[in-house]
């Protein structure tokens, strides 16, 4: 039976994700990935330049959605309600966790040794800079709001987001419990931003 190139590539990615989840990036070997995928190591290199590229390809959907959170902060397109709309925020967090739980585990806990091992701190710094610029744009649209919020607080707010994701990944909870916890977190967040911004 002849396998299509796309099928082989998908098989490699599926096998690699299993190995990464079991061993983490650092201890996963190309030999084991090849064995699990039923191909030779040299065959893997027809599709991926190295182990890092495989890892990044697996995590691409997770990374795309996280970066979308940053690049969707366009003051020209958004209203102040983005900070106050708890239903929208609850849905976003819930869907993100449900869709990416295993891959979030890879990114947050098993990326040591990969090009993504410092992703959390790099993302936090980028989010802090982006939100600061976003606040300037929002101030022009809503002159009454307070944007005198320290960069360190914005930084901490992103750190808390990762803490939320970590806890939900580490502790498998029933759907109802997760819904309640996310609702509590978002209620706390939206009330806090409303108070800080005098919105």
Indicate residue ranges for each PLM-predicted region:
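N-terminal intrinsically disordered/low-complexity leader segments
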Residues: 1-5, 197
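Short, basic, alpha-helical segments at the C-terminal edge of helix-turn-helix-like DNA-binding modules
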Residues: 5, 30, 60-67
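Helix-turn-helix
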Residues: 11, 15, 19-53, 57
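Alpha-helical DNA-contacting segments of helix-turn-helix folds
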Residues: 56-62, 119
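Hydrophobic alpha-helical connector segments
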Residues: 57, 71-99
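Short linear capping/connector segments at secondary-structure termini
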Residues: 71-78, 107-114, 143-145
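Amphipathic alpha-helical packing segments from all-alpha helical-bundle domains
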Residues: 95-96, 114-140, 151-158
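Hydrophobic/aromatic-rich alpha-helical bundle segments in the mid-to-C-terminal region
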Residues: 105-109, 138-188, 196-199
């Amino acid at each position: 039976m002849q396998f299509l190139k796309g099928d082989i590539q998908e098989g490699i990615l599926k096998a690699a994700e299993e190995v990464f989840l079991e061993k983490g990036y650092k201890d996963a070997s190309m030999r084991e990935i090849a064995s699990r995928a039923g191909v030779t190591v040299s065959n893997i290199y027809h599709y991926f330049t190295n182990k890092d590229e495989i890892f990044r390809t697996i995590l691409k959907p997770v990374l795309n959605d996280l970066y979308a959170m940053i690049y969707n902060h366009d003051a020209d397109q958004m209203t102040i309600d983005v900070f106050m709309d708890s239903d929208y925020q609850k849905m976003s967090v819930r869907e993100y966790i449900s869709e990416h739980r295993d891959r979030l585990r890879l990114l947050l806990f098993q990326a040591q040794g990969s090009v993504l091992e410092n992703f959390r701190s790099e993302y936090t710094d980028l989010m802090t800079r982006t939100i600061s610029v976003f606040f300037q744009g929002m101030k022009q649209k809503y002159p009454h709001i307070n944007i005198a919020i320290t960069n360190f607080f914005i930084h901490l707010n992103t750190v808390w987001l990762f803490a939320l994701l970590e806890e939900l990944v580490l502790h498998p909870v029933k759907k109802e419990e997760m819904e309640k916890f996310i609702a509590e977190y978002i209620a706390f967040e939206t009330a806090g931003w409303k108070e800080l911004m005098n919105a």
